[in-house]
């Protein structure tokens, strides 16, 4: 670049207003992506070294041994350097999206768009939170003597979901790491929070490690996050006790309330990436967004489709790495908008609506469905007049209402579940929560699958896979159970029912190892036992639990749509798929003929790549993909997901594409 151009660029930087933009790159450097993902490569090792041991353990549990993906590779250093040489200061590096964010003027935007390795330059939207968070200060005390702990005025909000019962069994969130994204946290001095095990905290507004108020914040900045933290994990006897009071925590301040409650998309995504790398098991966010800065254009209801907003795409990617993700459904029930708000529209996030202590839906609680028709919210919890800590005090509390109050209660229940069963994968957790909530037989777009229950979730049977062995776990809490009476009765297809004795492995936990079967066979079972008074119990009371051998998800009321026999719709082959070496990636399936096989493939960021509608023939059918998008370009290296609708069922298939 000659001197005159430099002067023009410099002068323009001074006089042109700057907004924040995402700069998306086409690749992660000139090296072949297959080589970059080689376990001996520098790029692979750098990605691996960015993860804590706990993060690696969680990924392996949920993803298997191929737990480093293209999204995890660092952004190519030379690309960043060339961008910075244009006078640009990079604000956030988002490896998952192969992008950086930076403040740019119009001249810089045009220069950057011309760079051969830049895919696109797009505005970072400012997400405005319509905060209907209502509160009043109250220091009343209420002692309750019929539970293991005295919950004080917080009793009604935890009792609705059966939390005191689980606490009485010495399950309180031990060995679980929870990440909270909120407005800030004044936790070090309040009596209910000061002894919490906070392993890391970061302020994504001011870029420092202080999440409590500091110079530049308004007084109410950290009020919301402090209150939310106490609902999840506060512990002051006779005043407030949250569900996960023995868990560990990571805190991220992502919301700026100095003028309006807002968070920039890149900060939210960066916080999730950071938490995931530290090994978080669960994330919870009480921030929901549907209104945006007019200068950056607004999202609409049609964007609440699980794959459009950056915050939603970020929670999708966190889930794919084994994190159980929670968020408030939103407080839009009384507004013209009415619907859930991003990131509650995510595919696998558990969005949480609000009910009162009697279980009645709160009028303000956002409703579903998503734009593409999925039921939302997933569950509800008490979110009316919940009792929690007041920031900037040592021992004052307040009542408040909102789905921002119900979300931490729900995420705390999952901490109890994971504490009881550390082997659970996040897809199992999500299924258990939906199956065990109060409305699972008739889910709707008001309360979803119903009121979440800690007791029901932990009593729901689950599977642990060790090599090729499938071990059933069933918690039985009834008093004076005859250990020798606990039986599982199961069958395959129309075979005769066979009873087998279960053994107690730990207190309350009875186990059974299923005999080896062929993948795809459907097993049905129920469990029986009796107590010392000869009372007989059958679980479930009628019908059967069921699961497809080779998978780890047990169903009762819900369809096992994505867990059907492998013989119906195959996995991708070859996988990984290398277009230079293989002509196509293939999926095989059987059909009776004249059926519609609908498939669309999305990339790791949730963007649709192709869509196909295939009319089937009788017998074997074949779907092939050559790696090219519907727009005609060869797709970048990364993880791709096929969503399939066929024969009244839905399937999900994963493919790694390497160039």
Residues covered by each model-derived region:
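Subtilisin-like serine protease catalytic core
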Residues: 18, 34-35, 120, 165-264, ...
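Autoinhibitory propeptides
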Residues: 77-158, 164-168, 194, 347
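Substrate-binding/access-modulating region of protease and related hydrolase catalytic domains
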Residues: 167, 174, 235-238, 251-348, ...
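C-terminal tail/sorting-segment detector
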Residues: 558-563, 569, 573, 580, ...
């Amino acid at each position: 670049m000659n001197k005159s151009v430099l002067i023009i660029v410099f002068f323009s930087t001074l006089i042109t207003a700057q907004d924040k933009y995402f700069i998306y790159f086409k690749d992660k450097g000139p090296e072949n992506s297959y080589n970059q993902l080689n376990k001996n490569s520098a790029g692979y090792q750098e990605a691996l070294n960015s993860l804590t041991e706990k993060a690696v353990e969680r990924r392996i549990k949920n993803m298997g041994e191929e737990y480093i993906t293209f999204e995890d590779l660092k952004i190519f250093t030379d690309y960043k350097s060339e961008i910075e040489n244009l006078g640009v200061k990079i604000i956030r590096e988002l490896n998952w999206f192969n992008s950086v964010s930076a403040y740019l003027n119009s001249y810089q935007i045009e220069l950057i768009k011309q760079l051969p390795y830049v895919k696109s330059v797009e505005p970072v939207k400012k997400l405005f939170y319509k905060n209907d968070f209502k509160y009043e200060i109250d220091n009343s005390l209420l002692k309750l003597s019929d539970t293991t702990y005295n919950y004080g005025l917080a009793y009604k909000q935890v009792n609705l979901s059966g939390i005191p019962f689980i606490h009485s069994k010495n399950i309180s969130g031990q060995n679980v790491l929870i990440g909270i994204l909120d407005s800030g946290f004044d936790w070090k001095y309040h009596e209910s929070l000061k002894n919490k095990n906070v392993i890391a905290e970061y302020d994504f507004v001011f870029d420092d490690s202080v999440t409590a108020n500091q110079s530049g914040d308004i007084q109410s900045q950290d009020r919301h996050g402090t209150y939310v933290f106490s609902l999840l994990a506060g512990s002051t006897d006779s005043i407030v006790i949250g569900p996960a009071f023995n868990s560990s925590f990571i805190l991220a301040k992502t919301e700026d309330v100095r003028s309006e409650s807002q968070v920039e998309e890149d900060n939210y995504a960066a916080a999730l990436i950071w938490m995931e790398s530290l090994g978080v098991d669960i994330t919870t966010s009480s921030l929901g967004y549907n209104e945006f800065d007019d200068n950056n254009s607004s999202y609409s209801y049609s964007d609440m489709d699980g794959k459009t907003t950056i915050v939603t795409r970020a929670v999708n990617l966190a889930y794919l790495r084994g994190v159980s993700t929670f968020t408030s459904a939103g407080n839009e029930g009384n507004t013209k908008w009415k619907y859930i708000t991003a990131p509650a529209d995510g595919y696998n996030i558990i969005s949480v609506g609000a009910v009162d202590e009697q279980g009645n839906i709160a009028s303000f609680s956002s409703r579903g469905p998503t734009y593409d028709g999925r039921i939302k919210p997933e569950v509800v919890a008490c979110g009316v007049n919940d009792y929690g800590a007041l920031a900037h005090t040592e021992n004052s509390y307040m009542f408040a209402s909102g789905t921002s109050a119900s979300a931490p209660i729900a995420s705390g229940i999952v901490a109890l579940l994971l504490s009881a069963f550390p082997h659970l994968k996040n897809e199992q957790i999500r299924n258990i929560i939906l199956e065990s909530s109060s409305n699972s037989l008739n889910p709707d777009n008001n309360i979803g699958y119903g009121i979440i229950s800690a007791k029901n979730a932990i009593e729901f049977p689950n599977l642990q896979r060790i090599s090729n062995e499938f071990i059933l776990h069933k918690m039985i809490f009834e008093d004076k159970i005859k250990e020798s009476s606990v039986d599982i009765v199961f069958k395959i297809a129309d075979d005769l029912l066979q009873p087998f004795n279960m053994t107690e492995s730990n207190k309350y936990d009875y186990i059974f190892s299923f005999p080896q079967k062929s993948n795809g066979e459907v097993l049905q079972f129920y469990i029986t036992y009796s107590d010392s008074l000869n009372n007989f119990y059958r679980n479930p009371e009628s019908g059967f639990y069921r699961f497809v051998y080779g998978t780890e998800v047990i169903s009762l009321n819900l369809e096992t749509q994505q867990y059907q026999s492998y013989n119906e719709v195959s996995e991708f082959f070859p996988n990984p798929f290398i277009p230079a070496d293989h002509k196509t990636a293939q999926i095989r399936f059987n059909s009776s003929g004249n059926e519609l096989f609908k498939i669309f493939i999305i990339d790791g960021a949730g963007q649709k790549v192709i869509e196909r509608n295939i009319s089937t023939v009788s017998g074997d059918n074949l779907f092939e993909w050559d790696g090219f998008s519907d727009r005609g370009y060869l797709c970048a290296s990364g993880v791709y997901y096929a969503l399939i609708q066929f024969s009244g069922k839905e399937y999900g298939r994963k493919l790694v594409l390497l160039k």
